[in-house]
Amino acid sequence: YYLSEAAKLDNSEKKLTFAARLILENMKREDNPGKKVWEAQTAATLFEKALELDPENEDLKVGLGSCYVYGEGMIGNAEQTMKGIQQLLQVVQKDSNNMKAQLVLGIGGVISNQYPKAIERLNKVVSFDPHNLEAVSWLADAYAAEGDKQNAVKWYEQSKHLVNNPDFSKEIDERIKEVQNH
């Protein structure tokens, strides 16, 4: 909280961006819906203030879109998911190889049940960076939701290789069983 207030008072793009990114990363790991919403709104405000200082900064636009998708979008607010997707689409229309934007668009596609588009975007990210665990995991989930068991299992197996942790592998094996039994 104090970091965000200090950044607003200082009003430098660097400090606003630092605070926004820190809050965004914390928000992505937050389980409490109330805290997640507060962090999303706080980070979004900081990204908006930074964008006022540097309106062409694509990373700031991706950060702002991410706040909407990972924040209220992740807990079921479709309007916020779409708001984030619109923000991110502006970025990929200028640069289709912006993998940060493609990743969050892919995640937004899964959240909003737009699986074919999500799969397309997430495949683009993993072809660019095959070790991107977040993209691989969401891609597996997207294929599972689409009913494509073979690809879901393939990407779940890939995630096990990337993490190489027995507890994680056990959890993924359970998920694979669920996919195969549906």
Residue ranges of each PLM-predicted region?
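Canonical tetratricopeptide repeat
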Residues: F18, L22, G63, V104, ...
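TPR alpha-solenoid repeat register
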Residues: K15-L16, L60, A101-Q102, A118, ...
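Amphipathic alpha-helical repeat scaffolds of TPR domains
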Residues: D10-E30, P55-G73, K100
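Structural marker of alpha-solenoid helical repeat scaffolds
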Residues: L9, L53, K94-D95, F128-D129, ...
